Amino acid sequence: MSEAEARPTNFIRQIIDEDLASGKHTTVHTRFPPEPNGYLHIGHAKSICLNFGIAQDYQGQCNLRFDDTNPVKEDIEYVDSIKNDVEWLGFHWSGDIRYSSDYFDQLHAYAVELINKGLAYVDELTPEQIREYRGTLTAPGKNSPFRDRSVEENLALFEKMRTGGFEEGKACLRAKIDMASPFIVMRDPVLYRIKFAEHHQTGTKWCIYPMYDFTHCISDALEGITHSLCTLEFQDNRRLYDWVLDNITIPVHPRQYEFSRLNLEYTVMSKRKLNLLVTDNHVEGWDDPRMPTISGLRRRGYTAASIREFCKRIGVTKQDNTIEMASLESCIREDLNENAPRAMAVIDPVKLVIENYPQGESEMVTMPNHPNKLEMGSREVPFSGEIWIDRADFREEANKQYKRLVMGKEVRLRNAYVIKAERVEKDAEGNITTIFCTYDADTLSKDPADGRKVKGVIHWVSAAHALPIEIRLYDRLFSVPNPGAAEDFLSVINTESLVIKQGYGEPSLKAAVAGKAFQFEREGYFCLDSRYATADKLVFNRTVGLRDTWAKAGE
C-alpha cells in the first residue's frame, strides 16, 4: 500500500492492543471469509480493508477463505472475481487460499462428536415444521418429537444422511441446546442439511453440507484465527459460535467481534436485491458502473486508493449508520483531481467556424497534462479554424453571470485564442447548427495587447482532428437516498442513471486504456470503458463530476 498516514484507531484495534499487551496473543491472525455466491460490493471492501489492514499493521496474517458450504448458489466465477477484487484493492492473503470445504472431513467428525455427547440429533421435521416449532421473539419454541433419539440411532441416521439415504428436506442434523432460549439462534439450530448438488471444489463426494454457524467457528479455530471480525447482524450468532467451540475437542477458541456494516445512500447492498437488478436486466451485469460492486466501481473508474481512503474515513464502530454517497464520490474526486491527466472532450457538440483563421491550415498548441504538476509533462493539441464546442457554452443572449461565449462578445479558447461570436446558422426547427466567429491572432495563450479583459474560458476540439467518442454519463442508480425502504425498491430506480452521448475528443485520447482516468476539462472525470471500448470505437464512462451536483440540487 502507498498510504503512509498514521494507523487508524477504533475499538477493535484497542482490543487487539490489549490482547497483545496482556500476552493473550503474541500475533494477530484475521480472515476474510466471503461466500462465493455473488460479486463483492463496497460493503465487503470495508471488511477487506479492516481484516487485511489489521494484519498488515500488526505484522500478522490474514487468510482469504471461501465459505463454500452451499453448492447450489456458488460458482467458480465468483471465486475468481473475489480473488481479483481483493488483489486489485491492494491486499495479499497469507499462504494458500482456504476453502471451508477443505475442512468437510473434520467438520463431519466434529458433528459426530456432538452426537456422541448427546448434543446433536437427526430431525425429520419438515423445514416448515422446524420454523413453526422454533417459536418467536415473544414465544418460546417447542421440542421436536425426534429430539430425544438415542446416540446410536442418531449416529446411524446421520450416516444415512451422509450416504444419500434421505431425500432433500427429509432430515437434518440439529444442535441440542434450548428451545426456550431467549435467543432464537440457540433454539436447536440446524448444523447439517442435505443437498444433492455438485460442489465446485469437492464434486459429488458429499450430499450433506454444514451450515454457516457450524462451519465458521470451526474453520476459524482450525486456522488459528485470533480475532474473528463480523458485522453486527452476527452478534447473536456469537453465542452459537462459542457454544460449538466449547463443546468439541479443539485446542483453539477464537473470539468473535462485531462492527457495523456499511450502508450507503442511493444504492442497495442486499445480495438478493443486487441479483434481482442483474437478472431482471435493470443493469447490464454485476460490473455495471452503476452497481455498488467493486467490479462495477472499478469499471466506472474508481481507484483502489480511493476506496481504501473511503473505508478509512468512515471508520469502524458498533453504531449502524448510513453514509452519504457524496463521501464516496469525494474520495475519488480528490484522488483524480490530484492524479488524472487532463484532456479536452466535447459532450454535446456544436460546430464553430473561425472565419478569419487561415483556411485549411492548422497548428499545434501546447497544453499541460496537469495544471499543478509540471512533472506530468505536456502534450501538443491540434487547433484549426473549425472546432467543436459544447452547446451549453454559447448563448445568443445572456446575463453578466454567464461567463462563456455570447453573441457579439469574446471568450478565450482553452490554451489558444480569444474569439468573438459574430453570427449563427440554424436549422428549420431553430436549433443552432453553426456558430461563426472571428479570432484575435495575437492572443495565443496571452492577453489581448490593448488590455481588454476576457473573463470566460471554454474548451474545444479541432473538428479536423477530433476523435468520435461515446460518452456514458452514469449517475446514481436510485432517485431516493434509501431505496431499500421503498415498498418496491425497483420503483425508485433513477431513469436518468445512464445517459449516452456522442461527442468528440482530442487526438491524445486514442492512447487511453481502461483503468486510467482523465479529467475532461470543465466536464468531470472519465475513463475508457473496459467492456464496450474498441480500437475503432472509444467509449468513456463518467466516473464522477467535478462537483457534487446532487447537493446543489437538494438546496
Swiss-Prot record:
One of its GO terms (biological process) is glutamyl-tRNA aminoacylation. L-glutamine binds at D67, Y212. The keyword ATP-binding applies. A motif ('HIGH' region) lies at residues 34-44. Its EC number is 6.1.1.18. GO terms for molecular function: ATP binding; glutamine-tRNA ligase activity. It catalyses: tRNA(Gln) + L-glutamine + ATP = L-glutaminyl-tRNA(Gln) + AMP + diphosphate. Belongs to the class-I aminoacyl-tRNA synthetase family. NCBIfam families: glnS, PRK14703.1. This is Glutamine--tRNA ligase. The lineage of its organism: Bacteria, Pseudomonadati, Pseudomonadota, Gammaproteobacteria, Enterobacterales.
